[in-house]
A protein has these predicted regions:
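WD40-repeat beta-propeller superdomains and closely related acidic/aromatic-rich repeat-like regions
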Residues: 1-330
């Protein structure tokens, strides 16, 4: 088990002039970071810069993913853009771009069986200030054509985060402090895009990594504040508490909350089955113990807001900060 208090910052990367909004470990092991108008690829051996993309200066790049096709990436802005790189990620070209009048935040890709021809097709689900936007890309072998908007799920609320729970279900979180609507978490069906259940009055953190699935039974969601629970195991009102909600996936309800001294912006399930949580001041490590998550260690990171955490390799973590820096801990 890694112990954060014994870790050292082995590298500080100063490649961005704006907040780090997204980090990604590519399928080939290289690292990608994204901020306002800038995407940077780093070599997996020593984290040296191998590709710097700066032509998207007008885009607020909120999230980047690698699609089912290797070395093909999609990032969100006022719409989304698809590009591919060479196998070593040192060259790139744009494949497709879609623009919208509102802001796109986070995207997930899922595959499904086409009932007509029994082929595997792909769709992209994207959260936005206008709700949830679904694009069907069909087989989309060249990634240049076939993209079509097929549905928008809108409950008069801004949806910041979405999370792929399994092959049948995804989750969305809405935050009224962003652009109106409810503070809630919703479970959705992939098959027909119906709302399975809504948990109201959860003010979820706006970060794109604020949800993590611990196992088949437990889901963790970081909260801006805890305002109301109303389950049989918790008090009816708990006001203005920063922390993490623990959800039981069998019953789809909150069963525990972990009160924290600061707002939690990011969550990560590590390869050794502990949870890392990035806050305004610290990175915390949790362990599941007798039905509860207990803090077992913490690491102060110079008062930087830790926006997103990825595991670069076992016991080596990369943390992206709102304060423009990237830290590597081992």
């Amino acid at each position: 088990m890694s112990v954060i208090k014994d870790m050292n910052i082995i590298k500080t990367i100063r490649t961005h002039s704006e907040a780090i909004n997204s980090l990604l470990i590519c399928k080939n092991g290289n690292l990608v970071s994204a901020s306002l108008g800038k995407i940077i690829f780093y070599d997996k051996k020593n984290l040296d810069v191998i590709l710097r993309i700066t032509e998207f200066k007008q885009f607020y790049i909120s999230h980047i993913i690698e699609l089912h096709k290797d070395n093909t990436f999609l990032f969100c802005h006022n719409g989304f853009l698809v590009f591919e790189t060479s196998e070593d990620n040192k060259k790139y070209k744009i494949l497709y771009s879609f623009y919208e009048r509102f802001v796109f935040y986070k995207s997930i890709e899922f595959d499904y069986m086409n009932k007509i021809n029994s082929e595997i097709n792909y769709s992209i689900i994207i959260s936005s200030t206008y709700g949830i936007n679904i694009f069907d890309s069909g087989k989309n072998e060249d990634m240049k054509t076939g993209w079509s908007s097929i549905k928008t799920l809108n409950n008069n609320e801004s949806v910041y985060n979405i999370f792929k729970l399994d092959n049948e279900t995804f989750i969305s979180t809405s935050n009224s402090t962003l652009a109106g609507g409810n503070n809630c978490l919703r479970f959705w069906s992939y098959e027909n895009y119906t709302n399975i259940k809504t948990i109201n009055n959860l003010t979820c953190s706006p970060g794109t990594s604020s949800i993590v699935k611990y196992n088949e039974r437990i889901l963790l969601v970081s909260l801006e504040k805890i305002t109301y629970f109303g389950t049989k195991n918790l008090p009816n009102e708990v006001n203005n508490i920063n922390g993490i909600a623990v959800l039981d996936l069998k019953y789809l309800e909150v069963v525990q909350y972990i009160e924290m001294p600061n707002k939690i912006r990011s969550l990560l399930l590590t390869k050794n089955n502990t949870i890392l949580a990035g806050s305004v001041f610290n990175v915390y490590q949790f362990k599941f113990n007798k039905g509860n998550f207990d803090i077992i260690s913490e690491k102060e990171l110079f008062n930087y807001i830790n926006n997103i955490i990825v595991e670069f390799e076992e016991n080596c973590f990369v943390i992206g900060s709102i304060n423009k820096l990237i830290f590597v801990l081992r």
